[in-house]
Amino acid sequence: MESTEYAGLRVLIIDDFPNFRTALAKNMHTLGFRHINSVSSGSEALSICRKNHYDIIFSDYNLGNGKNGQQLLEEIRYLKLCKLSDLFVLISADTSRDVVMASYDCEPNDYLTKPITGKTLEQRIRRLLAKRQELSPVYTAIDDANLDKAIRLLEELLNANSRYSVDCQKLLGDLYLRQNKYELAEDLYKTVLSSRELDWAKVGLANVELAYGQYGIAASSLDVIIDDHPSYLKAYDSLSDACVSLGDNDRLQKVLEKAALASPMSIGRQKTLADICLVNGDVASAIKAYKKTIKYGANSHYDNVDNHLNLARAITKIYDEDVDAASGATLDAIHLLNNIDAKYEVSDAQKIQATLLNSQINALNGNKKVSSDLFNQAQKLMSQAEERDVEVEVEHVNALIAGGKNSEAKDVIDEMLIYYKNNQSALEKIDFLLEEPVSIKGKKIIGTINKKGIDYYKSKDFEKSIEYFHKAQKKYPRYIGLKLNFVQALISSIKDDGYNKDYIEKTRSTFKVIERYVSPKNDKYPRYKQLNSMFHQAAQQAEYQERTRINKEKQHD
């Protein structure tokens, strides 16, 4: 494409520095572009993109307050304000690893590092537009949802030995998978790999294995790819899909943690990590991931009220693990919930959830009057709701328990179990309120983990037993039987192996949680009292032995 042909193309430049906008516009004009607009912020860019179509968009990564370039690109695509053939070039003076990884992860058409010379700009523009011209019919077919036509065009380009054969192969493999042409995809990826060991082809082949239902094989393949190339983020995404298909939430969390470590500013993965941590009962990790989701997702299309509600929800769950540790996190949650409707448009259900969560946290933090007032507000809002919402009802029960109204909470739970008896999805949410799960999935999970914990306990492998009981009671924090199994394994380890500060502290904190739920009328109360007495004896003996050991060492020195 000659420079005279650039005159009809529209260009948008986004940068918060006027001098850079002017310099880049001047360079583009010199190259032959005549329709050039420039703005200083992401919000201005979105506004102008809603009104006009641009063939090329240049955006700085750091745009000051508001959206950054990565978030802008993601939102433009999310809102479908650009076509596949349009070019988005991300520019940055920040070459830190986190920024570069996040930038490449959102797949701009190119990435330029400041300062940019006129020669570099010209070379990149010519290369990008030449590729655009050759692949334009393919892009148009995809935009028109005519994927079979796009496949035919790509096959023709490959048969003609297109200079963009690698791009054609990558796109063709994706389209084969989307159109369920798995054998063709497999042949393509194997052909590519027979001549070059390319990461995208390896992941593509693993995606074929996923499509065939070979989840374990695919997961093993992807593990190898990640070990060899830990920065290739698409491998983590495919491995996450494999874990979901295998129903292995624990492994899924580990995969997402590695992905978040590789690219901390990848907002979507941080959110997915936070969600699965909450499902797994790993509330400390959930809180960290939700905070990062909120931090990095501010001003992006990932920024929504549910992230804040889930952060508050995770904070309330700390009380089911460690009462002492929970108090330090509550102030953030209260501030967040008090201001949530000032920033977002919240639905009626979200407003009720926020109020109930706020009531819980204030009750657990000792602010009984504030908690009661908030609870009454929520009750009024619930009475006006047109439809039932199981998530609202779960928080209603949690608020009752936090306020010491255990009898009322039990009545509400009993009614919920009757109403939702044929709704497994709802029952899975209710499981977290119960001493024992009632959903099919919950019973299966808890049965498997609990059995393993008991088997290890019987064989006196207390460390493994503790690991399994700890995992199970995090998933189902109100299951008192599990907590008692957990502390029994901890006590047995202390008695057999001696002083262990971590185990003693875990036992004490778990007993504090049990005390919130087990009254003298509870059938678990006698076992609780017996184990509590055993613990005090074991802890005193272990601490005495530890002091004696330390004193002997001092005398020896």
Predicted regions and their residues:
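Flexible loop/N-cap segments at domain edges
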Residues: 186-407, 411-413, 425-430, 441-458, ...
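C-terminal output helix
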Residues: 116-125
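Alpha4 helix (beta4-alpha4-beta5 surface) of REC/receiver domains from two-component response regulators
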Residues: 70-71, 84, 94-110, 123
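CheY-like receiver
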Residues: 129-181
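Conserved phosphotransfer microenvironments
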Residues: 60-76, 84, 492, 503
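Conserved acidic segment of CheY-like receiver
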Residues: 6-19, 24-28
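Short hydrophobic/Thr-rich beta-strand motif most characteristic of the beta2 strand and flanking loop
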Residues: 33-41, 48
